Amino acid sequence: MFVEALKRQNPALISAALSLWQQGKIAPDSWVIDVDQVLENGKRLIETARLYGIELYLMTKQFGRNPWLAEKLLALGYSGIVAVDYKEARVMRRAALPVAHQGHLVQISCHQVVDAVAQGTDVITVFTLDKAREVSAAAVKAGRVQSVLLKVYSDDDFLYPGQESGFVQHSLHEVVAEIKKLPGLHLAGLTHFPCLLWDEAAGKVLPTPNLHTLIQARDQLAKSGIAIEQLNAPSATSCTSLPLLAEYGVTHAEPGHALTGTIPANQQGDQPERIAMLWLSEISHHFRGDSYCYGGGYYRRGHAQHALVFTPENQKITETNLKTVDDSSIDYTLPLAGEFPVSSAVVLCFRTQIFVTRSDVVLLSGIHRGEPEIVGRYDSLGNSLGA
């Protein structure tokens, strides 16, 4: 999906990854991340958000819940980390990093609510009154007031499978009335997902029905005299979409893919955020005229299409296609069109969620001053593997 953008925006990352692979320092099935470019992307996002008065929570799941990289990004001015599930929150808190938003996309499990509240999470999203009551009890126990967001939806909204949740908009007044009765809770705002999506036909990011539901819910509360301070609208957050969010009065957004430049809008390599990540593998064997590279990093929604194959003997890079991958099977190997020498390196660049892969994550610094070095090596869940 992003091979051309990678070649255009960050050819030095390709060269650095291949060089370190030749030295035996990077193994197949590794996501190789250009730390300096991620930080530059992160800085651009912060600067753009400030221009429009939008606060940013940092999303880490796309780059493997990596605490080292998260700490560097937080130093740029992000308002804390959004943990999309309780396991991500655990990784970040073990690294002593601030989790600002928890409960969306995945609710906090019952026996972890107390800890989430006690740790000082800025806002917790709730999908049910039952969960709100758990948060209330934890807040009372901790002797603090916990801010919460309500996830809302309407019947015609778009919800990804596995993410069906929230309070239906027409019940909002009744829900808010119940929330107000619960001690230790402060209704801080509303959220939904996805609020923006890339439209291939239009060639740009457009609002979803979900964003309109979110705005209607805010207005519905305002008419009843209930003011909220946070309107959180995640999905497709980037330098070019932040102005659109500002038009709708959004106060908070949660960039993820934009940090690595792997947003659909950047397929041609023409966005402010530059590609900062690639996946490196190696030819394992041939079968019936095609080559197979080591798998483990495939993501079925990643739109991976093209690959670069590097043969050390002649220092040649050849472009080929990734053949159809059966999404119902484990990606032990991935098929590439044509035969290439065994043990040639393979580079792909596609949209990923590293935390659902089996990949290693290799952090590189110094690429653009001609001195690439590995500054960290992690698994896909943010656990250090040593330098």
Predicted regions located by residue number:
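Active-site loop ensemble at the mouth of alpha/beta enzyme cores that anchors a bound cofactor
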Residues: 237-316
